[in-house]
């Protein structure tokens, strides 16, 4: 007997044809015009689309429901499409992390995860800040959420040095401690550093930790209106050098809008060679902050 049978369903592959979907042990076992066998539960899709669940590749899960604590001024600064605005926003938002506590963070994580499940989001890459203010409280709270929701959500916890590693004393050691606690991914945000040398050290250090722990990499790169930022290129080269192709993801990359075409083409070639995926965070496109012109196809 099937656990679930969905009737009168449309799928992306069947067009207007209505089909039935059989599910056993949490897996789809049959899709046909008529699936044989009885089911413990029958759901009538009423001609609606049944499709894959959603993936959220970039969610700061330790910060959900904290806007009032961080302040509207921090959000306003981030919306300024320039280097100073983005950096100032992060600095302002950092102050409230001194009150980070796993006990209230897990409550917020639960609320966000319940909404994710409700709206069909079953995979989340969840960033948790690791620095002298946040300490490991965010990581602990998000790891706890990962375990509580593991039957409904696939949550990957990113140990994320939001305030930098060169400019934030002790951050490198805290990242290692976060990985020892059970974080799944090594994060990074090299553009937050003050010099190009420090940016490169940030990229190299986090990538070396990824190799040490055999983990994937997920970094926020060039998230500023500054055409001179090159941390995405740094990551591409490091990934190729260390043989980590296909195991790194780049987030935001807003500066790509401003690159001249010849450099843009070079960067795209490097991305392909490094097999780096890009999460563009389309909410910023929806808000009309920038409109990148892509070259080629």
Regions found by a protein language model. Name each.
Residues 9, 26, 47, 58, ...:
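Divalent metal-coordination and catalytic microenvironments
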Residues 7-12, 116, 272-295:
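C-terminal helical cap
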Residues 65-105, 231-249, 275-278:
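Active-site gating loops and adjacent loop-to-helix segments of metal-dependent hydrolytic enzymes
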Residues 1-37:
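N-terminal metal-binding scaffold of metallo-dependent hydrolase/deaminase domains
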Residues 137-151, 167-278, 292-297:
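Histidine/acidic residue-rich metal-binding segments in metalloenzymes
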Residues 88-99, 107-137, 142-143, 150-163, ...:
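Divalent metal-dependent hydrolysis catalytic cores, especially in the metallo-beta-lactamase
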């Amino acid at each position: 007997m099937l656990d679930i049978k969905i009737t009168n369903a449309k799928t992306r592959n069947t067009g207007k044809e209505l089909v039935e979907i059989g599910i056993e042990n949490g897996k789809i076992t049959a899709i046909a015009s008529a699936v044989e066998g009885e089911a413990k539960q029958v759901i009538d899709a009423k001609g609606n689309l049944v499709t894959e669940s959603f993936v959220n590749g970039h969610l700061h899960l330790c910060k959900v429901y904290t806007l009032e604590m961080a302040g509207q001024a921090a959000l306003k600064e981030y919306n300024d499409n320039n280097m100073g605005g983005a950096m100032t926003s992060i600095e302002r938002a950092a102050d409230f992390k001194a009150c980070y506590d796993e006990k209230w963070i897990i409550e917020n994580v639960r609320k966000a995860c319940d909404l994710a499940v409700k709206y069909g989001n079953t995979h989340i890459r969840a960033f948790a800040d690791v620095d002298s203010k946040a300490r490991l409280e965010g990581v602990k709270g998000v790891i706890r959420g990962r375990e509580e929701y593991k039957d409904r959500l696939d949550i990957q916890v990113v140990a994320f040095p939001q305030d930098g590693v060169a400019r934030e004393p002790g951050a490198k050691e805290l990242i290692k401690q976060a990985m020892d606690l059970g974080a799944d991914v090594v994060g990074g945000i090299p553009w937050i550093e003050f010099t190009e040398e420090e940016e490169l050290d940030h990229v190299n250090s986090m990538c070396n930790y990824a190799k040490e722990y055999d983990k994937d990499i997920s970094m926020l790169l060039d998230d500023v209106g500054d055409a001179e930022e090159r941390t995405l290129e740094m990551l591409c080269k490091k990934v190729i050098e260390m043989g980590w192709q296909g195991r790194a993801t780049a987030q935001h990359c807003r500066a790509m809008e401003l690159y001249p075409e010849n450099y843009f083409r070079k960067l795209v070639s490097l991305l392909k060679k490094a097999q780096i995926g890009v999460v563009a965070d389309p909410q910023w496109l929806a808000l009309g902050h920038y409109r990148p012109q892509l070259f080629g196809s």
